[in-house]
């Protein structure tokens, strides 16, 4: 999830890395803009009794205590059933009956690894591959702390000359080939950022390379660097130079979940398929900027200098020219030993029964982390989920009964490839298709002060209205709303969902979804140590969110969303916004086509389908107004809720996208060469990228048909046209 709030015009260039967005709002001085608007308490909409009770139920002291618990015990996927049970027990204690749902999945764990550089003169240098122990940060010294490694990486050894491949995108490799760089049989060294890390490894593998090293570059830290005079963590907000980003290298753009059970749940007796199409065959190792420095410097003067490569973000901020190499006689030797296993994982599932059994709202966060801590990813969200359970419990004691059933989920094994949530969706898909109204996801709830939002279009209006009800503690201010800060930082644009967190399986089964969190501005806020030992309770309490006040505000926002989706008589969807957003997606597609090999490609079928959708959506909006005024017409309200629940299923096409049938939504999907960042009308754009006109025409047809199906569901309300005529 990377570009802060995704500009539609930048979709093709957008890139994503991990569960957090790659932000760049440094050109916007948020605090200055807010200050110019004046002080004083913001005008808040009237809050209902239950809204006020919900908001007032969140307490920073108890959130702090939940965060401390989650960040002081190992909880890499499949290793801590007691933490899953503790979560279920806490939810139950607060009035939400909860239990564990387990799956037996393929995972792998690190045994040993090494990396060394041999110079042409025969001298050698050994990489540390270890993050420094900090006396100020207790969990960095735990004896069972997790080594630096890549989940789903291949075991293997490799010794060879090496090539710097930039961010490891396909276009980076294409540029290297243009420059005459021999890649086959070499080891790749790539910097983080851009495509999902697994695709960096895949792209190297596809070029015949035999290993891949991925490092973190300080150029991605904006102005918050030691070079700019700031101190490194723990003494200041800059990145600790020994920090290493762990993470999965599954080929996420192909499909998420257990690589051995695509399309069906992983039970002990489930048949297993070959995992090789979606996991690497070559070894990979993540390293720190400290370890990367001598490796890059050894390439200076060999191959093409970085500035002459002419690729975006090729040159970083380390003391090297970022030359391509290879350097004759300079070789890397790498060893990576992993233990493959099938192991149980545990989802904690809690249920608040509603009065309408065929309408369900799901709220989820993953619990597993690559490190002991995980204070931001994911346990800022986990602590909020416990506090949300407490808040919902208080509402129930006060007499609240939701109209729709609420299912709360604490997922396991998200980090390996959205495994826990995907297996659960695959098991319960018939029920979800028949009942699910929406899925709300919170992953990295807090890693900084700037709120962020991505959602399917029907949820935009509810989200923005809810933001205006939450006081946002931006850098100590108490006179501004969440909406004010978000709107200033994002320009008012809600992001498009691609992949990278647990909403993925819901989106691609046509279920309305939303993902939210808060992070740094990418330029001036303290650097977030993503997937590092330094994503710790100490970092969060000192730099990320001292006092845990942003946690509280984010929990209030999530609570309001869940409350209204579960309680409002009419599901609070804005279906007309789907037409607005599809028109924007189409404008992007037209520009993409104009720059392609087939500029004459006709998209009039999509235009006609969107027009048909708009007619149906506008008719339903009129019906909603009628139902709101006629509170006694429960039949009409039920019809409206049914079509609101179901219309999104229409955008899902059987067979999915070319060569990746898991991704079935015809309007958006993770980019084939990004892994996380979204592409709109993906079947068409991928066909254009492949130079396949016939297939592009096919996916124009399939996309337009999907839009017509969704429009038809909106029009399926009994005598809808008659209702509109009576208006």
UniProtKB/Swiss-Prot annotation:
SUPFAM superfamilies: PA domain (SSF52025), Transferrin receptor-like dimerisation domain (SSF47672), Zn-dependent exopeptidases (SSF53187). GO terms for biological process: proteolysis. Glycans are attached at residues 60, 80, 223, 310, 319, 353, 614, 692. Substrate binds at residues 197, 516-518, 530, 675-676. Its cofactor is Zn(2+). Disulfide bonds: none annotated. GO terms for molecular function: metal ion binding; metallocarboxypeptidase activity. Residues 266-565 are annotated as: NAALADase. Zn(2+) 1 binds at residues 366, 443. Binds 2 Zn(2+) ions per subunit. Required for NAALADase activity. Keywords: Carboxypeptidase, Glycoprotein, Hydrolase, Metal-binding, Metalloprotease, Protease, Secreted, Signal, Zinc. GO terms for cellular component: extracellular region. Its EC number is 3.4.17.21. Has both folate hydrolase and N-acetylated-alpha-linked-acidic dipeptidase (NAALADase) activity. Also exhibits a dipeptidyl-peptidase IV type activity. PANTHER family: N-ACETYLATED-ALPHA-LINKED ACIDIC DIPEPTIDASE, VACUOLAR PROTEIN SORTING-ASSOCIATED PROTEIN 70. This is Probable glutamate carboxypeptidase ARB_02390. It comes from Arthroderma benhamiae (strain ATCC MYA-4681 / CBS 112371).
């Amino acid at each position: 999830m990377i570009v802060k709030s995704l500009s539609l015009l930048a979709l093709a260039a957008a890139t994503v890395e991990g569960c957090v967005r790659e932000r760049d709002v440094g050109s916007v001085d948020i605090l200055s803009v807010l200050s110019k608007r004046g002080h004083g308490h913001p005008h808040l909409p009237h809050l209902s009794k239950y809204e006020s009770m919900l908001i007032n139920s969140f307490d920073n002291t108890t959130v702090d205590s939940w965060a401390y618990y989650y960040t002081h015990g190992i909880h890499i996927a499949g290793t801590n059933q007691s933490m899953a049970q503790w979560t279920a027990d806490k939810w139950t204690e607060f009035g939400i009956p909860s239990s564990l749902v387990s799956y037996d999945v393929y995972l792998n764990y690190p045994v040993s690894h090494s990396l060394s550089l041999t110079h042409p003169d025969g001298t050698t240098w050994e990489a540390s591959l270890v993050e420094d122990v900090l006396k100020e940060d207790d969990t960095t010294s735990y004896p069972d702390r997790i080594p630096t490694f890549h989940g789903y990486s291949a075991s293997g050894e490799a010794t060879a000359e090496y090539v710097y491949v930039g961010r490891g995108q396909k276009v980076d490799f294409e540029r290297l080939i243009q420059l005459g760089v021999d890649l086959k049989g070499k080891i790749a060294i790539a910097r983080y950022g851009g495509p999902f890390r697994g695709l960096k490894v895949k792209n190297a593998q596809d070029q015949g390379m035999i290993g891949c090293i991925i490092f973190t570059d300080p150029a991605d830290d904006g102005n918050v660097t030691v070079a700019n005079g700031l101190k490194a963590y723990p003494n200041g907000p800059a990145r600790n130079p020994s920090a290493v980003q762990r993470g999965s290298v599954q080929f996420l753009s192909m499909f998420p979940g257990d690589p051995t059970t695509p399309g069906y749940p992983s039970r002990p007796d489930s048949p297993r398929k070959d995992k090789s199409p979606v996991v690497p065959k070559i070894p990979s190792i993540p390293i720190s900027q400290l370890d990367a420095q001598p490796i890059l410097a050894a390439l200076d003067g060999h191959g093409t200098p970085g500035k002459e490569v002419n690729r975006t973000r090729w040159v970083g901020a380390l003391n090297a020219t970022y030359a391509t190499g290879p350097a004759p006689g300079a070789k890397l030797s790498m060893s990576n030993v992993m233990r493959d296993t099938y192991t149980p994982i545990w989802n904690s599932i809690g249920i608040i029964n509603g009065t309408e059994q065929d309408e369900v709202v799901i709220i989820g966060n993953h619990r597993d982390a690559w490190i002991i801590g995980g204070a931001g990813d994911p346990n800022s969200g986990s602590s909020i989920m416990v506090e949300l359970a407490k808040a919902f419990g208080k509402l129930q004691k006060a007499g609240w009964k939701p109209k729709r059933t609420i299912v709360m989920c604490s997922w396991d094994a998200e980090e390996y490839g959205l495994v826990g949530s995907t297996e659960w969706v695959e098991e319960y898909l018939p029920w979800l298709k028949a009942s699910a109204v929406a899925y709300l996801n919170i992953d990295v709830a807090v890693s900084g002060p700037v709120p962020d939002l991505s959602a399917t279009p029907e949820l935009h209006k509810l989200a923005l209205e809810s933001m205006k009800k939450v006081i946002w503690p931006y850098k100590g201010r108490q006179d501004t709303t969440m909406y004010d800060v978000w709107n200033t930082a994002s320009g008012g644009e809600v992001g498009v969902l691609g992949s990278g967190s647990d909403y993925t399986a819901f989106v691609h089964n046509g279920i309305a979804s939303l993902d939210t969190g808060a992070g740094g501005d990418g330029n001036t806020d303290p650097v977030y140590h993503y997937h590092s030992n330094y994503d710790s309770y100490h970092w969060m309490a000192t730099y990320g969110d001292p006092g845990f006040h942003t946690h509280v505000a984010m929990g209030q926002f999530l609570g309001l969303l869940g409350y209204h989706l579960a309680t409002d008589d009419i599901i609070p969807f804005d279906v007309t916004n789907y037409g607005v957003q599809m028109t924007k997606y189409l404008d992007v597609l037209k520009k993409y086509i104009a720059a392609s090999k087939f500029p004459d490609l006709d998209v009039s079928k999509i235009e006609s389908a969107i027009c048909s959708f708009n007619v149906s959506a506008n008719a339903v909006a009129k019906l909603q107004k009628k139902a709101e005024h006629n509170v006694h017409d429960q039949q009409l309200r039920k019809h409206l809720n049914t079509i609101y629940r179901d219309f999104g299923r229409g955008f899902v096409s059987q067979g999915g996208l070319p060569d990746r049938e898991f991704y079935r939504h015809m309007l958006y999907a993770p980019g084939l060469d990004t892994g996380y960042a979204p592409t709109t009308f993906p079947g068409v754009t991928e066909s254009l990228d492949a130079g396949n006109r016939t297939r592009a025409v096919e996916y124009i047809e399939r996309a337009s048909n999907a839009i017509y199906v969704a429009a038809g569901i909106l029009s399926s309300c009994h005598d809808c046209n008659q209702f509109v005529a009576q208006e």
